[in-house]
């Protein structure tokens, strides 16, 4: 990745696609600007489970199209403590990732690994899991992350100031994941636009990715899409087949959507936390272990995806409530990660606290596939900023950043000065 490559990433469009207050995130409650954590605490204190949807329960009454929403014809339940959230995401037999009844034709025809469960989910996840294990982080860093990070810093280093939220934090995971699928820089924003149109951009997505699939079938390269193109999977009948184009497109859509849409907000959250705590910022600059701890603490303290849903496969009981089969159960990871029964001073950002498991990347069989890549992106990017930009600090003349959003949360900006 070079400076000339960066010039192909149109800045105005980049800002539009990653504006939490803009149209792209409107259906996810992007402009909801209340502090959601007092409401999370209030709800948890009166019981771990509440009938209803997280948004309205905390004061957000806008329309929302998100995983588990809207489903107006189904009962909804929301979970706010750590133990119950953890139990829900671990129990895939009772709380499914698919909206369809287990064993139904619709469930068996799911093309998205996110919506699969059980043995079928494990078979498909196993295909790409080796590319996302911790020891493969170096591959991602050397192939895409490191060059992207330094090319981006080159583009604004002489200015003495920058808004890191979009021109840095958003661009890194976008160019990393699209690069791993063989998508050129000029088309990276087209991919991002396609995967954020709630199904309306599928034609554009296929037009870009299908030719790459065909090219990799003829000649593999050292990238993620080649791994998918040449993977084989065993079906329910025990027959082995090479992944079809539709199966690859399903994988690609999920990985490109998630890979370009989550890490940037978490990186911004981590940076604003460190910039607001200068002692921790200095410690993170001097010690990579402190930076790793800071990233992990930001995932606990303010996860960018605070809510994820499951679907009850049978009549069950949860937190004292009868939950009918087909109900939507919203696991509120943001509330769970500040459960005072698990963490002392849960509202404080404290990278020095004892490390224990959190739900910043979800949990159970569907724990985030790309979590080690996300950690590598944040570690590499923030370390490079601290090394290359002397006296990095929040811009005193800019508006103070705020973390906003209902179902996807991130900072309004990360304005910095340096030098």
Where are these regions (language model features)?
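Cytochrome P450
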Residues: 1-419
């Amino acid at each position: 990745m070079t400076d000339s490559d960066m010039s192909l990433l149109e800045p105005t469009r980049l800002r539009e696609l990653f504006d939490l207050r803009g149209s792209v995130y409107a259906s996810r409650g992007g402009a909801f600007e209340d502090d959601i954590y007092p409401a999370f605490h209030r709800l948890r204190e009166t019981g771990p489970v509440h009938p209803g949807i997280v948004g309205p329960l905390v004061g957000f009454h806008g329309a929302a199209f998100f995983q588990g929403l809207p489903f107006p014809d189904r009962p909804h339940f929301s979970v706010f403590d750590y133990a119950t959230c953890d139990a829900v995401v671990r129990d895939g037999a009772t709380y499914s990732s698919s909206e369809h009844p287990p064993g139904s034709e619709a469930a068996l025809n799911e093309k998205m690994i996110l919506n699969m469960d059980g043995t079928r989910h494990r078979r498909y996840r196993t295909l790409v899991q080796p590319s996302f294990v911790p020891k493969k982080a170096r591959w991602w860093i050397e192939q895409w992350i490191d060059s992207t990070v330094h090319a981006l810093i080159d583009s604004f280093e002489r200015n003495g100031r920058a808004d890191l939220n979009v021109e840095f934090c958003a661009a890194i995971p976008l160019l990393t994941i699209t690069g791993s699928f063989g998508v050129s820089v000029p088309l990276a924003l087209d991919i991002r636009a396609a995967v954020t149109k709630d199904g309306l951009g599928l034609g554009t997505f296929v037009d870009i990715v299908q030719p790459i699939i065909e090219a990799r079938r003829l000649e593999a390269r050292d990238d993620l899409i080649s791994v998918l193109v040449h993977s084989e999977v065993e079906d329910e009948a025990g027959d082995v087949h090479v992944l079809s184009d539709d199966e690859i497109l399903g994988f690609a859509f999920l990985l490109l959507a998630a890979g370009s849409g989550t890490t940037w907000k978490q990186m911004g959250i981590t940076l604003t936390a460190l910039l607001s705590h200068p002692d921790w910022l200095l410690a993170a600059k001097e010690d990579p272990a402190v930076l790793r701890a800071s990233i992990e603490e930001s995932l606990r303290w303010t996860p960018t995806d605070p809510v994820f849903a499951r679907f009850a496969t049978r009549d069950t009981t949860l937190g004292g409530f009868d939950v009918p089969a087909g109900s939507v159960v919203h696991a509120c990871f943001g509330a769970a990660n500040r459960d005072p029964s698990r963490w002392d001073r849960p509202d404080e950002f404290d990278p020095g606290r004892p490390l224990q498991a959190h739900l910043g990347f979800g949990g159970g069989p569907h724990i985030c596939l790309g979590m080690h890549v996300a950690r590598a992106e944040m570690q590499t990017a923030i370390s490079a900023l601290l090394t290359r930009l002397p006296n990095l600090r929040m811009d005193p003349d800019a508006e103070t950043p705020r973390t906003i959003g209902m179902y996807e949360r991130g900072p309004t900006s990360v304005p910095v000065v340096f030098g």
